[in-house]
């Protein structure tokens, strides 16, 4: 490993460690739950009855969201440059592991400008995170990537799908604690 790679790895680890502190300084507010009066964003999420995603995972496997029908799915758009996004990853992994054996999946879609950023992050994570905490990782710029969820002006942006594949909640910014209760109820 060259000195440059060691420096890059040290910087990435430092960024991961400092992410919670940075995220608390500028955490955007989540959208209200769907049982609240419908905002424009909530109405937009509800208008996407059955999202469709077709892609290759970052390890080259074909992926289609339709394969997860019958499961509760949390689809999160994120970026390695987003402190709030990186801050949420350990929470996502912990809950994913906690619901192992239940019909629950997480799909993380990196919106990084270049795939190498997502690959570098995954390489670091693969050294520290057990396999049972790993979920589907996709890069939105990969050849053949398609989704009908549109562009995301703010990250993270997450969609909660019920077992019928319909959007029941949309979150922008931090995923609130109530989201985990909602997921538990859907399971």
Q: What is each PLM-predicted segment?
A:
Residues 71-73, 78-81, 154:
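Short pre-active-site segment immediately N-terminal to redox-active cysteine/selenocysteine motifs
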Residues 21-23:
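Boundary at the C-terminal end of the N-terminal hydrophobic targeting segment
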Residues 77-94:
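Conserved redox-active cysteine motifs that mediate thiol-disulfide chemistry
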Residues 29-31, 154-187:
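Thiol-/selenol-based redox modules, centered on thioredoxin-like
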Residues 103-117, 131-142:
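Thiol-based oxidoreductase modules, predominantly thioredoxin-like and allied folds used
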Residues 8-19:
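Bacterial N-terminal signal peptides
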Residues 122-159:
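Short, internal strand/loop/helix patches
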Residues 26-65, 133:
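N-terminal "domain-start" segment that seeds a small globular fold
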């Amino acid at each position: 490993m060259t000195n440059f790679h060691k420096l890059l790895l040290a910087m990435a680890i430092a960024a991961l460690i400092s992410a919670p502190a940075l995220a608390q300084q500028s955490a955007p507010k989540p959208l209200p739950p769907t049982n609240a009066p419908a905002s424009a964003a909530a109405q937009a999420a509800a208008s996407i009855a059955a999202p469709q995603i077709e892609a290759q995972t970052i390890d080259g496997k074909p992926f289609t969201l339709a394969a997860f029908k019958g499961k509760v799915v949390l689809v999160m758009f994120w970026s390695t440059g987003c402190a709030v996004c990186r801050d949420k990853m350990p929470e996502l992994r912990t809950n994913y592991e906690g619901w192992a054996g239940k019909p629950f999946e997480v799909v993380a879609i990196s919106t990084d400008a270049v795939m190498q950023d997502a690959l570098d992050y995954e390489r670091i994570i693969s050294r520290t995170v057990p396999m049972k905490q790993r979920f589907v990782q996709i890069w939105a710029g990969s050849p053949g990537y398609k989704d009908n969820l549109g562009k995301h002006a703010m990250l993270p942006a997450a969609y909660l799908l019920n077992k019928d594949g319909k959007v029941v909640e949309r979150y922008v910014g931090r995923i609130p604690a109530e989201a985990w209760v909602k997921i538990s109820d859907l399971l």
